[in-house]
Regions:
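Accessory alpha/beta interaction modules
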Residues: 1-159, 169, 278
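Short amphipathic alpha-helical signal-transduction/dimerization elements
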Residues: 102, 106, 129, 167, ...
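C-terminal segments that line or cap access tunnels to active or ligand-binding sites in enzymes
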Residues: 157-169, 178-183
Length: 278
């Protein structure tokens, strides 16, 4: 019998679901951190007791970042970014997402009883298949500095790194460059990316992962449908408000054109009347 090919079989490392599962392989993840920071790391620990597919608080997506601590208690947050996301007003989301991740990392540490002056060093790391800053750097690293004197750094031990897989400027190790090439083209060019490719094959054949991916797909489908329904509901409300404001449509006409129930329209009419009087 011919084996049925699932969506999981088609995924490459640039997919955030698969990227997370590869990063959960300690040997690979530790090696990437060692190559990025040019240092030996004795061990890493995953900060989530159980690796789950967490939904963002605003239900706009599923969190697929990986949180790690090394033997020096430096904390890392890793995530794959294939697209440059924008919000509904057209504003790029990544810069403010870094604030969310930083708050999450710090809050987790403080909840464990640490005083703020004991907060661990943190690195928020995005693997990006696009050049967010359009300067062709392979790595963009951000730390807080004084605007009046850029030599003065605020020593809060928090850094944000954007790894640009398309970059051509700046030095990275051969294994990091081969990883970038593998992310971009799915082409093995080194012993390390051969290990990554073999690991991906193992992951795709793991029944638990396959079941997890089915759950992930269903949850993503639910989120998309909820977002669509939310958008449709807002559009219906907007149409009804405009028609009520015009004052020349009957309630039945508004029901037919907006798709809202007559009870909802009457409530909306009362709310608008109260707002007008306020």
């Amino acid at each position: 019998m011919k084996k049925q090919i699932s969506n999981l079989d088609k995924l490459t490392l640039s997919n955030d679901f698969l990227f997370k599962h590869v990063m959960l392989r300690k040997r690979i993840c530790k090696h990437i951190l060692e190559e990025l920071f040019h240092t030996k790391i004795a061990d890493i620990t995953y900060l989530e007791a159980e690796q789950t597919l967490d939904v963002y608080p605003d239900s706009h997506g599923i969190r697929l970042d990986v949180r790690i601590a090394d033997d020096t208690d430096t904390h890392y947050n890793l995530e794959m970014q294939v697209k440059n996301p924008v919000n509904r007003t057209g504003e790029f989301q990544l810069p403010k997402r870094t604030r969310y991740y930083q708050a999450m990392l710090d809050t987790d540490m403080l909840q464990k009883g640490q005083d703020y002056d004991e907060l661990s060093p943190t690195y928020i790391i995005f693997f990006c298949l696009f050049d967010f800053f359009e300067d062709s750097q392979r790595i963009y690293t951000f730390k807080r500095r004084c605007l009046e004197n850029m030599e003065i750094e605020l020593a809060d031990e928090a850094a944000i790194m954007f790894l640009n897989t398309l970059g051509t400027k700046g030095d990275v190790s051969p294994d990091i460059q081969s990883l970038f090439d593998y992310i971009n083209s799915n082409t093995v060019t080194s012993k390390f990316t051969r290990e990554v490719a073999d690991t991906i094959t193992e992951i795709k054949n793991d029944k638990k992962v396959r079941d997890s991916y089915m759950t992930y797909e269903m949850r993503m489908k639910d989120i998309r449908e909820e977002s669509l329904a939310e958008g449709e509901a807002k559009q219906k409300l907007r149409v009804a408000k405009l028609m009520l404001a015009k004052g020349c449509y009957s309630l039945q006409e508004i029901v037919e054109l907006s798709g809202l129930s007559i009870d909802n329209i009457e409530k909306l009419k009362n709310d608008m009347h109260i707002e007008k009087q306020a």
